[in-house]
């Protein structure tokens, strides 16, 4: 028995040495796709009608249908700068009847294997949302594709998504770095809430609605953040501007710093908020939700105001009170707009109730939109100006 074991050891060692990776691809034979831009194809209207009719079609007619135009952007690693760690962008644009079809057509046009494990940016053309049946197929593919990076950032773009991939930013080598950095900077002042694929899937499954950042392209080179789109059933219901997004993130308690402004005696005064403490008290009485927001902030005054001489002055208290009233009014208008007009829970109130008040959630979950619309919501805002800046 011992001799048999001794004889088996060399065989096992040889088998380990002969083991290899059967599907390995050299790194210089890969195209690391960083940006995926999806536009409508010339035949998308016909494709949408076929989906709605639920008719069976021949394979030949499917193959001829250019439903989508997809652009894959990737860095040119042949000319990568070793010091900067970056390279200029290359792209491949193909048309097809589905995301799978465009992928295989892109492979046929490329001498390299497309790799999606490091993808950073997904650009969805605004026109796609005019065809929710097609967009649903696109998103189903994206959600299920195992090779796609789950932290890829998602955005909606006005105009052709392909045009954004071709932009050469002044401050970055690649468009994916530029837009993701732009969203990162904007999130610091509360004007945008970056959304990656994982967060998008969670929003859709939890609320059947989502919000995505919206960008526009001016003069073929100037990319601007214009706000956020509210999406339900793969259709854009409305848009939220930067100020509304700031208020949403304050009410969510999901913001680090931001800026608010008022006008006092002809002077514009900026209040740079450094800290936000948000509390939401939730109660359920007489078959009705009762919600109370308490928002406490600390920050610094910016801009010119001649009478702001000391933190103890009555003028500072007046300014604080004016900001309290202004912000409370903005918050109330936003809440009424989102629950009565949009009928979408963009404030994630349902998430708070589900996580921390399960008993209340069981009472309202079957009729959540109506329960939110009928809820009594009150708001209290307390601003604390800690600093008025330097003066001579």
Each model region followed by its residue ranges:
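Positively charged n-region of N-terminal signal peptides that target proteins for export
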Residues: 1-7
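Membrane-proximal alpha-helical signals and transmembrane carboxylates
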Residues: 7-10, 15-392
